[in-house]
Amino acid sequence: MKNGKYVILCIDDDKDVIDSLRVILESNNYIMVEAFSAEEGLKKYTASNPDFVIVDLMMESVDAGRAFVKELQILNNKAPIYMLSSVGDSLASNIDFSELGLTGVFQKPLDINTLLSTLKIKLK
């Protein structure tokens, strides 16, 4: 938390997704920290100490999102981590999300109400 607002780290290589998340989050009184790759996401994670993490499953490499989450486990992450996944993403259907260390999954296109209600519940 920073200045009384929750910090949300969003990692996705799609600028349109990042821009959409920024509009939604900032208009609902959250601070958004962005990253466009898993590597950049790790740097932003350690610098910002986020309260909640949203990471795309498929980024610059097929399992960049998974590798990022594993790195957070090594860092003893306590923030809820939600993976972004495309509807019908065959890789997503083959992953045990809880075993990977994820709190949950958001399907693309992202439903604003689902995002905001999840944040409200998980950040109590």
Where would I find each of the regions flagged by the language model?
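The short loop immediately C-terminal to the conserved phospho-acceptor aspartate in CheY-like receiver
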Residues: 14, 58-60
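Active-site beta3 strand of CheY-like receiver
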Residues: 48-55
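Non-catalytic signal-transmission and effector/linker regions of two-component phosphorelay proteins
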Residues: 1-7, 111-124
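Conserved phosphotransfer cores of two-component systems
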Residues: 46-48, 72-78, 100
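Helix N-cap/capping motif at the beta->alpha junctions
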Residues: 34-43, 64-65
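Hydrophobic/aromatic residues positioned on beta-strands within the core alpha/beta folds
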Residues: 84-86
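Alpha4 helix (beta4-alpha4-beta5 surface) of REC/receiver domains from two-component response regulators
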Residues: 63-67, 74, 88-106, 113, ...
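Two-component/phosphorelay signaling modules centered on CheY-like receiver
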Residues: 15-33, 100
